[in-house]
Amino acid sequence: MKLFLCSHFSSVGSLIKEEIENKKVAFIPTASLREGYTGYVGSARKLFKKLGAIVTEIDISTEAYSTIQSLFEDADVIYFTGGNSFFLMDQLRKTGTDELLKKELEKGKLMIGESAGAIICAPTIQYIEQMDEKPEDYSQEDDAGLDLIDFYVLPHYLTAPFKKVTEKIMTEFSDLNLCPINNRQGIVIDGEGSKVICKD
């Protein structure tokens, strides 16, 4: 399994450009759909284009399962934008895309998760509720994440406008194995373990 988890993809994506150049990317903006600010989605698109990736966008909350399946099977890289972690996780579980994703990752494909896309990889996403409001129509009975990693990514650490809330989460969830990253850091996870890399 290969993962690249970050706070702000367009700031750090070039660190893994060899994994992206001329590759087929399934681009999933679903987490951002209900957000007021979505500038990060456009900047991610631009970086993928600059790196020569062949990008296909798909919204898992509205697209047919068979379409998602064929796109995931065809893709080299599966990318999740930032946005609301609870909305994204709800849609992944509701549609069965969570299991589809795990199947493709088992084949060695790369998943890139930005902010919400990184948070959902943890065993649970309950720790992020102070940063991400749970939607009123959230349909899951628990806050389970994808459980792809054994730690909890805390994106935008000490970065405006999340400085106070990230400090608060670090204090309140000190018993969790939190991994705080700022907007110029990313976490590479592969068969050998995980490491934080940084854009100068």
Provide a role label for each language-model segment.
Residues 1-77, 81:
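N-terminal beta1-alpha1 cap of cysteine-dependent amidohydrolase-like domains
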Residues 144-149, 153-191, 197:
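Conserved anion/nucleotide-ligand pocket segment
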Residues 13, 35, 88-89, 121-122, ...:
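Glycine/Thr-rich phosphate-binding loops of Rossmann-like dinucleotide-binding domains
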Residues 33, 83-86, 117, 158:
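Short glycine-rich anion-binding loops that position phosphate/pyrophosphate groups of nucleotides
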Residues 97-159:
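Class I SAM-dependent methyltransferase SAM-binding "motif I" and its flanking Rossmann-like core
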